[in-house]
Amino acid sequence: MNKRSIIALSTFLFVVLVTLFLVSKLQTRELNSRDYIQSRTPTLFFHGYGSSANAEKHMVEAARQAGVTQTIITATVDSHAQVTFKGDIPKDAINPIVMVEFEDNRNANYAQDGEYAAAVVRKLQAKYAFKKMNFVSHSMGNMSILFYLLEHAQNEEFPKLQKQVNIANHVNGLEGMDLPANLTILDNHTGQPSAMSNSYQKLLGLREIYPQDQVDVLNIYGDFKNQSDGSVLNVSSRSLKYLVIDNAKSYQEKRVTGPLAQHSQLHENPEVDRLLIDFLWGK
């Protein structure tokens, strides 16, 4: 093959690749309106203990790749509850995502974690004046948003929570730590557990103040082995139901199995990605 032929072939292949790329981008834009709602409501992602916004990247990128949104920012909150944004949300942004990062990420004072979450919501509200929002949380991030709700669920100045995705939540204790002995679910209809950890008892107030007929709740837990994700018993995760079922607009549980059902792998799990994408943004 002579030099001219090589150049011609290279040019042809380049044009083909560019065309395929543009077609792919157009298909992604089509998905935005065909398969997913077109909303200005932001979705906030909260990571777990000792973690960072990196733990949220797989889920967020899955949403972006699916064509849900092209607007992703990071909100970092320090130990003084001061919030810094990286990126901006345009006025016409569709389904914007906020990746929340706690610098004080090993603080097991859940009430304080809840105030860190409140600081992010407050700053987001002040800058963008959103009326509604969604939450996605993993592991201790669940405690952050639940204790946030315990203090601020009825705060009329904050955006109203619309959808809540809880992943690998340990609302009624962690194995080897604060898990009540012989924990079971006494009543599958109400979700009432047989025993309650100290933190769970503090959250019982949610049964009274959780927003009435406002929030759709998706509770995802992993059955990696022996009805546990390796760190949290399924019965602890499922204890969430008792706190919200009487007031939630809807409540559903999803059990995930397989190697990626392990506690720290759930936020890297394509099945979890699909569950939360369909729940939050599916038409």
List each model region and its residues.
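Lipid deacylating catalytic domains
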Residues: 4-12, 16-136, 140-283
